[in-house]
Amino acid sequence: MEKAKQVTWRLLAAGVCLLTVSSVARADSLDEQRSRYAQIKQAWDNRQMDVVEQMMPGLKDYPLYPYLEYRQITDDLMNQPAVTVTNFVRANPTLPPARTLQSRFVNELARREDWRGLLAFSPEKPGTTEAQCNYYYAKWNTGQSEEAWQGAKELWLTGKSQPNACDKLFSVWRASGKQDPLAYLERIRLAMKAGNTGLVTVLAGQMPADYQTIASAIISLANNPNTVLTFARTTGATDFTRQMAAVAFASVAWQDAENARLMIPSLAQAQQLNEDQIQELRDIVAWRLMGNDVTDEQAKWRDDAIMRSQSTSLIERRVRMALGTGDRRGLNTWLARLPMEAKEKDEWRYWQADLLLERGREAEAKEILHQLMQQRGFYPMVAAQRIGEEYELKIDKAPQNVDSALTQGPEMARVRELMYWNLDNTARSEWANLVKSKSKTEQAQLARYAFNNQWWDLSVQATIAGKLWDHLEERFPLAYNDLFKRYTSGKEIPQSYAMAIARQESAWNPKVKSPVGASGLMQIMPGTATHTVKMFSIPGYSSPGQLLDPETNINIGTSYLQYVYQQFGNNRIFSSAAYNAGPGRVRTWLGNSAGRIDAVAFVESIPFSETRGYVKNVLAYDAYYRYFMGDKPTLMSATEWGRRY
C-alpha cells in the first residue's frame, strides 16, 4: 500500500494526475484555500498521508501549492524519477526551492551512480559546490575528461575544505597525472592564508615524493608560525615560499609585534625580498603598533613605515589615531598623505574643513561643508550642525498607485501568502528574485507596495536592491510604531532612537538570526535576553525562540537599550557603540581619548570599522525617524555635541 502511494505521489508531481479531482471539493475563496493549506500541513506533520493525498488536488490554484509539491518531491527524493524533478523545476522557474532542488537532485543521481542521467538532467554546471563536484565527476565517467579536469582545477583552488563528494573527482584527477604539483602549492598557499592549518597539513602530506622536503617544512610552519625564520633560511627563495613566509609572519606579528619588527631584516635577506615585499611586512607590523602601549622607538618606526606605505586603509587608520588622541599636527600630516581619491570621502573632506576653520580660512571651510550638506548620511548632517544650519532631507517620492501588472503573477501571490503566514525569510527569498528582475522605476513601485502592505522588511529590501537611497520613507518605515511607543513609554530612550537601533540591526526582518545567535528585530543574544528579563522582571519569557516574536523582542530590546543608555549618561554615541561592541570596549576607548576630543572625532576614531559605521548609521537613522515623527532631523543633542570625549 505504501509503495502504491509513493508511485501515486511521483506521478502527481510529474504532472500526471491519477486522482479523481472531481471527488474532492475545490476551495474557491482565499480563506478556504488557507484553511485547506493549514489542514494539509497539519496532516503532513502528523504523517496522515491519506488525508494529504485526498486534499492536495483541490488546492492547485493556491499560490503556495508549489511549496507543497516541493515537500512532496523531497520527502521521497531517493525514489523520484528525473522527469518528476525536471517537470517541477521547469514549471516553477522563479521558485527559490526549485533552484536548490536542482542541485540536490544532481547529488541524488550521483548517489545512484547514474552519471549519464545526471548530465541529461543538468546539462549546465549546477549551483552548489557538492553538485559541481558530482557534475564534473560525471563528465569524467562519461569520457569528457578535459572538461572534468578544468572543473576539478577550479574547485581545487580554494583555501577552504571542500565537501566529501569532491574527493572522488580530485582522486581521479590526481591518478590521471594531469594534476600539476604546483596546484598543490597554490592550494596550500590559499589554505595557509585562510588559517586552515588542518587542510595545509593534509595537502602537504599528499604531495609527490620528490616534494617531501618542502612538504615537511610547510607542515612545521603551519603548526608553528614562529618557525618562520627557520623556514625562510632552509627553503629556497621562490614566490611560493615568500608568500608562505608572509602569511606566517602576520601570525607572529599578531602575537608579538616587536619580535616581528626585529625579524624583518633577517627575513628579507633569507628570502631575497624586494622593497615592495619588505614594505608589506612593515605594514603588517604597523597595524599592530597602533595602541597606547608602544614605546617611542616603536612609534617612530611605525610612522616611518606608514609614511612609505601605499596602503590607503593603513594611512586612514593613522589619521583616526591622530583624531583619537587630539593630535592636530598629526591629523594634518596624515590627511596630506592620503591619495586624492581617498581625500574625497565624506569623512576626510569634513576633517580638511575642520583644519581650515582652525587656521581661520572660514570661507574655504564653509564651501566644503556646504558641499557636504548636499549629500545624505552622517557627515552631511555633521556639516550642517557644525555651521549651525538646518539639514534638509532630500526625499524621493515613490508613486502612491502601483502598476497593477507588478502586483499580479505567481511570484507576488506567493509573497502575499508567505507574509500572511509570517514566513518572512522565505518571503524575502521570493521578494529578492522578484525585485532583482525589475527596472529601477518598478523597484520603487514595489518598495511602495511593500510599504503600503506593512511589509516593512521587504520595503527596505527593495530600496537596497534598487539603490533607492533617497526613498527615505520606504527605507525607514515607522515599523511596529505602536509597539515601540508602548515599550519606550516611561523609559529615557527616545522612541526614534530605539527604532533606529532596530532598523540598523535587522532592517526590520523579525525572523533574522545571526551566525552567533542574535535574534529578531533588535538582534538580542539569548544570554542578554535572560539577563535583561531578570533585571527588569519582564514576565512571560522562557526560551530564545520567543525573540523572533516582534513584541517580545521589542520589550526586551528596549529594556536592554535603556540599561546601556543609562550606563553612559544618556549619550547615544556611547550606548550605540556599547550595543554593538560591548560596554567594556567603549570605556576603554573613552579612557584612551581622555577628554581631549569632540564628538565627531570620537566617532571617527572608533577602531572597529563595523562599530564606527554602526554608530554613524544609528545617529543618522534616528534623525530620519525623528523627521518622520514630526521633529527636526538634528544629528546630535546639544549635550552630545558639546561635551568632550
Can you say where each PLM-predicted feature lies in the sequence?
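Bacterial N-terminal signal peptides that target proteins for export
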Residues: 2-13
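Structural motif corresponding to the intra-repeat A-B loop/turn of tetratricopeptide repeats
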Residues: 46, 75, 79, 108, ...
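N-terminal signal peptide c-region/cleavage motif recognized by signal peptidases
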Residues: 20-25
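Catalytic glycan-binding domains that act on GlcNAc-containing polysaccharides
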Residues: 70, 269, 302, 307, ...
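Generic helix N-cap/helix-start motif at coil->alpha-helix transitions
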Residues: 28-36, 48, 60-67, 79, ...
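Alpha-helical adaptor scaffolds
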Residues: 72-74, 86-90, 102-107, 282-293, ...
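Residue-level signature for tetratricopeptide repeat
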Residues: 42, 71, 75, 108, ...
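Alpha-helical repeat scaffolds
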Residues: 51-55, 81-91, 114-124, 146-158, ...
